[in-house]
């Protein structure tokens, strides 16, 4: 699908111009092994990754900085009834995919086709807007282009085959003022929830945002940047690059994913707080000012909403945004334990495939839609708690509580916790040259797999030696 400059007014009106500019330049490849290892640490009950670093997660701040999508706006919560979708699609874009074929034998059922179209069908019919197209035709092609992009990126379902009808329906009116940023994060949270609770592979959601979030903060599976390709903003601030431009052209990994997955698992098990880039977007006056390029203003337009504790809504999916659990990522005081907020198992159970009878999600989730609107209203009215700056001692106390309260390792430990030294003062250790290099690098070797290997090897050899002693042998005879 090629972009046509005639689409720009409609993409701008829909609030998607910064994001479309990002993805049409081509997006960096996902490191599937690193993402899988990271998702192993996801906990649906807190919407955070549980690591030795404490809790970490993708927040509204990250979505805004990486994608340039608006946070302020309306939750995307509508009627997803697909009854008569073919007639509606025909009216909206002028054509529909062919009907499924009739079965050749009477005893076979008719092929079931999801409401929507395959990406192949869309590409074959809407790849290029005709040069002599009138305004209505250009508008149609722009609508289909946006449908194609959001279905493949923001709302990817893990199959890479179909663009659901509901996302095209959401683009019926361009100026709907959707809160695309909160919608994208809600969908990503739900995909992470589902992926962490099932035994089969596959995950959807905006993996572009998740990947760049990980690369910015964690030195595990981080690629090396090669260069920046020229970015023509056409003197339009909304066409300036987002923070994702820092990862414009990368060196791709060609290693065996199964081997790298084991390595990444070990590294994530061993990563420590001082090896994390906690505030990658800068601090104070330098916040949001990358040295290499000018940042798109949409990245920071809604920064006053980043700390909202609110429901994030994407049709059937309602997921809570809990930034107070990861205040260290904002350079703020981390209390312990963080105030508990129930993420509600009943909400997690809501699924458009399992609850087919529920169609009008705007009515079903009205309470949460109102909560989101009130959260925005309270922030804009200046009604929010005063937040304190990061305190190293408080964060150390939080870590002591956190590590005693949850599981942070995926791999079976090779040692008993009681043999470890007392916790160090993390902010002091962070100044050590090794940890500074790790934060900026792309691996925590040798402290992760190597340390685990050495300890396990020593334990195995010690066990072998002890078995040769009189006390260790069953017959009472030993070599010593």
Predicted regions and their residues:
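Structural stabilizers in ordered domains
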Residues: 1-480
């Amino acid at each position: 699908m090629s972009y046509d400059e005639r689409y720009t007014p409609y993409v701008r009106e829909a609030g998607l111009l910064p994001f479309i500019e990002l993805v049409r330049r081509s997006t960096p490849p996902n490191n599937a092994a690193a993402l899988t290892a990271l998702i192993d640490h996801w906990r649906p009950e807190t919407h955070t990754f549980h690591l030795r670093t404490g809790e970490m997660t993708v927040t509204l701040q990250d979505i805004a900085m990486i994608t340039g999508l608006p946070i302020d706006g309306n939750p995307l919560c509508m009627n997803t009834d697909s009854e008569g979708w073919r007639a509606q699609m025909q009216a909206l874009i002028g054509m529909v995919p062919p009907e499924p074929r009739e079965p050749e034998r009477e005893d076979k059922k008719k092929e079931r086709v999801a409401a929507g179209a395959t990406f192949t069908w869309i590409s074959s019919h809407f790849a290029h807007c005709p040069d002599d197209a009138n305004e209505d035709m250009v508008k149609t092609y722009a609508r289909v282009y946006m449908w194609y992009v959001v279905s493949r990126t923001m709302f990817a379902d893990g199959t890479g085959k179909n663009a659901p009808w509901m996302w095209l329906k959401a683009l019926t009116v361009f100026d709907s003022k959707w809160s695309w940023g909160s919608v994208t994060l809600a969908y990503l949270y739900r995909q992470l929830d589902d992926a962490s609770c099932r035994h089969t592979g596959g995950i959807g959601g905006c993996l572009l945002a998740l990947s760049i979030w990980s690369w910015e903060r964690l030195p595990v599976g981080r690629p090396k940047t090669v260069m920046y390709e020229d970015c023509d903003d056409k003197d339009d601030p909304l066409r300036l690059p987002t923070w994702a431009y820092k990862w414009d052209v990368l060196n791709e990994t060609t290693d065996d994913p199964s081997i790298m997955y084991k390595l990444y698992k070990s590294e994530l098990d061993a990563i420590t707080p001082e090896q994390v880039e906690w505030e990658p977007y800068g601090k104070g006056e330098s916040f949001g000012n990358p040295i290499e390029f000018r940042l798109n203003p949409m990245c920071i337009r809604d920064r006053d909403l980043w700390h909202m504790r609110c429901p994030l809504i994407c049709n059937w999916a309602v997921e809570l945004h809990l930034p107070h659990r990861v205040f260290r990522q904002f350079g703020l005081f981390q209390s312990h334990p963080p105030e508990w907020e129930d993420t509600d198992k009943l909400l997690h159970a809501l699924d458009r495939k399992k609850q087919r009878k529920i169609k009008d999600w705007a009515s079903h989730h009205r309470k949460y839609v109102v909560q989101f609107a009130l959260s925005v209203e309270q922030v804009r009215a200046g009604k929010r708690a005063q937040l304190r700056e990061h305190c190293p001692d408080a964060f150390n106390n939080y870590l002591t509580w956190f590590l005693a309260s949850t599981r942070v390792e995926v791999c079976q430990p090779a040692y008993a916790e009681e043999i470890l030294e007392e916790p160090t003062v993390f902010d002091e250790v962070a100044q050590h040259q090794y940890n500074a290099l790790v934060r900026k690098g792309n691996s925590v070797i040798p402290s992760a797999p190597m340390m685990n290997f050495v300890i396990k090897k020593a334990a195995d050899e010690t066990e072998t030696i002890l078995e040769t002693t009189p006390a260790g042998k069953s017959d009472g005879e030993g070599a010593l």
